[in-house]
Regions:
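Nucleotide-activated sugar donor-binding and catalytic core shared by glycosyltransferases
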Residues: 1-221
Length: 221
């Protein structure tokens, strides 16, 4: 059999002569992610991070050039929403040092997950440990999915959506085009054309509770 991820792919292979009877739509296996923690573990993680009711924005898998965009947005939004915190998770460990410098330049109090720093006295935590990002989505308010304001093509938004969290991204998401096409039909995901638009999209998720609750509900559709 010929198994394709999207209906568009099925059409394309049929157009170039693939036999109809063996060409099947399989769907995207990346839709099959499941949450790995129960509500007790999620509460425990929030306590471990000492979030104390703060709303944490998770900036996930950021690439070169994106950290500045996120830090700038956070700086603007922090003036309006004093209860927000930022978890910044660079995609590549070799960039940790550079990203730490960028964070330090903002003047915000910050810590590092590798030092077991918490949000108790910090506005920003850099996630510089491996294998923890997935569970961090469970305690975020919403997530920015990186690789989408660089030429990388984005990362998987479902990793945040499965926890019921909406996502914001830049428009460069060709790696997950079909997933984003599906998610952006509702408010589960929003693609922003510019850093300014991204800041506004983030602002709406913080300022408009009805919109935020709808966006959260849309993630499970």
């Amino acid at each position: 059999g010929i198994f394709m991820q999207t209906h568009g792919d099925v059409e394309r292979v049929l157009n170039v002569g693939a036999p109809n009877d063996i060409t099947k739509f399989m769907g995207n296996l990346k839709f099959d992610i499941k949450p790995t923690m129960n509500s007790e573990q999620i509460t425990e993680l929030a306590q471990d991070l000492k979030l104390n009711g703060a709303r944490m924005i998770a900036a996930a898998s950021t690439h070169k050039g994106e950290d500045e965009i996120i830090l700038d947005a956070f700086k603007q939004l922090k003036k309006e929403f004093c209860d927000i915190k930022l978890l910044l998770a660079p995609r590549h460990p070799e960039r940790y040092e550079k990203v730490e410098q960028l964070i330090a330049q903002t003047g915000f109090a910050y810590g590092k997950r590798s030092n077991n720093d918490t949000f108790e006295n910090n506005d920003i935590i850099m996630l510089d440990t491996m294998g923890e990002l997935m569970k961090m989505f469970s305690v975020c308010h919403f997530a920015y999915i990186g690789g989408s304001f660089s030429s990388t093509g984005g990362h998987n938004p479902l990793e945040a959506n499965i926890w019921g969290k909406p996502v914001v991204s830049g428009e460069c998401v060709f790696n997950f085009k079909d997933i984003y096409e599906f998610l952006t039909r509702s408010d589960a995901a929003k693609l922003s054309a510019t850093p300014e638009e991204l800041t506004n999209d983030m602002r709406r998720l913080l300022a408009d509770n009805d919109f935020y609750n709808k966006a959260c509900a849309d993630t499970s559709k």
